[in-house]
Amino acid sequence: MEEFQGYLELYRSWQDNFLYPLILQESIYALVHNQDLGLNGSILLSKKKGYDTKYSLLVVKRLVIRMYQQNFVILSLNDSNKNEFFVPNKNLYSQRISEGFAVLAEIPFSMRVMSSLKGKERKQYQNLRSIHSIFPFLEDKFSRLNHVLDILIPHPVHTKILVQTIRYCVKDISCLHLLQLLLYEYCNNGITLKGSVSNLSKNKNQRFLLFLYNSYVCECESIFVFLRNQSSHLRSTSYGAFLARVYFYLKLEHFLKVFTKHFRVILQFFKDPFMHYVRYQGKWILASRGTFLLMTKLKYYFVNFWQCNFYLWLQTRRIYINKSLNQPIDFIGFLLSVRLNPSVVRSQMLENSFLIYNGIKKFETLVPTMSLIGSLAKAKFCNVLGHPISKPAWADLSDSDIIRRFGRMCRNLSHYYSGSSKKGGLYRIKYILRLSCARTLARKHKSTVRAFMKRLGSEFFEEFFFKEEKVISLILSRDSSISRRLYRGPIWYFDIFCIHDLASHND
């Protein structure tokens, strides 16, 4: 039991004192007030390990001096309207203090991440940072899994739970009192952590609230780290190592060395992990090859663990057990599912013949057509039923600008959803955008869509084709079998670094 307890300590030795001399001697809201200077991000550290910033403490000192030299009496009303820093607001100072607290609190967490990469040269290869790079891994692993746990991340019922979470990483009592004071004031102003991550990012105190949310979720995820370590005897390297190809080769080389030295005969150590885990859009997704009974036991185990250790009232109906063969999962703008392809093989032995029915699992990535149509309807490209309509807001633009905007949306969608196994939904979305563009141009010129399309001809659709589609159509005929396989099969690209706006569910 003592050995298991050590896994749940969660880096308790990483307890740091924050930079309180800087807080007490200077005005902390000057550190984070950078809107009028055009600065981005944190300006606190000079060249601290783990921070990529070109600003130094000298800039902070100049900001403080500039603030002290301002004369608040002679400020006109027009100046105060331009700069909210000088607007009388009782919540302004607490907001600046909270943002400054988040800047300082991020220091030990950044040092913890950098310590895992100690002694390694950090090289960046953009082609391995693509969102699409995870799908080839899922194609190999996901089809072997049986059940998926879809867990909605529980929200803390009281602010003291957040303070207790930070207490594991910070031993400064005054820091905890300051945190509790800020949370108490935010609760009085109606600012809480209840809601999704997208709602938190829209808040004015997003840096402070996101820091609390991430630290709280990190503490709740300790049970997943514990289960992962118990199910696999060879621990994986840090997630940051997978940002570069060189670390992948180093890990592979280390794997071969360990295999030849220690585990030459005992091959069961190299079995697949007990479960696969990912956090996405305010929920946890766990996939495993276990039975339904095992997943049910894990479900109630998670509920009891979070209630006893973090005082979270997590109801069992917020955890869903999905069979990966039937119910698709929404992940990074795609619908993931595993389809069973039946096949019949006729076997004959001497004079007797019989049929053998086999089922082959196939991993599928589908385009969420209904959610994309809903996003297009909100953007006024179509109605809720998916019927294209004109875009009145773009009717004042030139014809080339209108065609360029619609064409860019089509190409971006084709680029992002090129890995879908079935392209029917993607073709429907592109059809909506093409016809919406034609209706917008016809509305501008006060003509009908048919007459306008007849006047433009086939050159009108050239702007809507993706460049890879043009190359394939030039090399191969559309009627050839190779061309049909290229169009229908998934194509993954390694230059996609963010989720498409229509698929992010934040609109």
Curated annotation (Swiss-Prot):
Entry keyword set? Chloroplast, mRNA processing, Plastid, RNA-binding, tRNA processing
Family membership = Belongs to the intron maturase 2 family. MatK subfamily.
Q: This protein is called what? A: Maturase K
The record ties this protein, via Pfam families, to:
Intron_maturas2, MatK_N
User: What job does this protein perform?
Assistant: Usually encoded in the trnK tRNA gene intron. Probably assists in splicing its own and other chloroplast group II introns.
Compartment list: Plastid, Chloroplast
InterPro entries given in the database record: Domain_X (IPR024937), Maturase_MatK (IPR002866), Maturase_MatK_N (IPR024942)
What organism is listed for this UniProt entry? Fagopyrum tataricum (Tartarian buckwheat)
Q: Name one GO cellular component term.
A: chloroplast
